[in-house]
A protein has these predicted regions:
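Short extracytoplasmic
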Residues: 39-77
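Hydrophobic core residues within well-ordered beta-strands of beta-rich domains
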Residues: 78-80, 124, 144
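Beta-strand elements of well-folded, non-transmembrane domains
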Residues: 86-88, 101, 130-134, 150-154
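Terminal connector regions
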Residues: 134-164
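Intrinsically disordered, low-complexity Pro/Gly/Ser/Thr-rich segments with frequent PxxP/GP/PP motifs
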Residues: 106-136
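Asparagine-centered strand-capping/turn motif at beta-strand->loop junctions
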Residues: 76-91
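Membrane engagement elements in two modes
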Residues: 1-55
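Short acidic, flexible loop segments centered on an aromatic residue
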Residues: 87-105
Length: 164
């Protein structure tokens, strides 16, 4: 009887530990961030397609500033990459990213219509691409704060990430 009581106590402690671990690891953790600048002239097809969609009213992304008189030689695409790790027991689903506060020169964010998920115990990358007008002073300024939103086990989780 004493051995059975000890086994029940050990099982209870192990179960409580597993529950506490699961609660504490619901939110994915940010492992790494990066910003990559690509001149719009070097990806002219993407730029031209985006301008056409803006003119037709079919652009599905988020517009921050004036889209008038966009020229490839005056713009650059900044791709923000956030690497996340999901240490929890449940997958992180419907992951999305957006700029918290666009800066001067940010024109729009390209649409991302895919459904992103991060399986339990895995690592994955999320990307957000922003078109910005470039000039000599602001060209090197890629620091932004991104808001990541996801759902884990039906619970909405929102956190901010700084990318330099």
């Amino acid at each position: 009887m004493k051995i059975l009581a000890i086994l029940a106590l050990v099982a209870t402690i192990a179960g409580a530990g597993a529950v506490l671990y699961g609660i504490n690891t619901l939110a994915p953790q940010v492992v790494q961030t990066a910003a990559n600048v690509t001149e719009a002239q070097s990806v002219a097809d993407t730029f031209d397609d985006m301008v056409t969609r803006l003119e037709n009213g079919t652009f599905g992304g988020r517009i921050f500033g004036g889209t008038d008189d966009l020229r490839a030689e005056d713009c650059a695409f900044v791709t923000y990459t956030v690497r996340m790790q999901n240490k929890g027991f449940f997958p992180a689903e419907w992951i999305s990213m957006e700029l918290v506060e666009p800066k001067d020169g940010d024109v729009l964010a390209l649409p991302d219509d895919s459904r992103h998920a991060l399986a339990a115990g895995s690592v994955g990358d999320m990307q957000l691409t922003v078109l910005r007008r470039t000039d000599e002073e602001e060209q090197a300024d890629t620091a932004r704060t991104l808001r990541v939103t996801c759902y884990v086990f039906g619970r909405k989780i929102v956190f901010d990430v700084s990318v330099a």
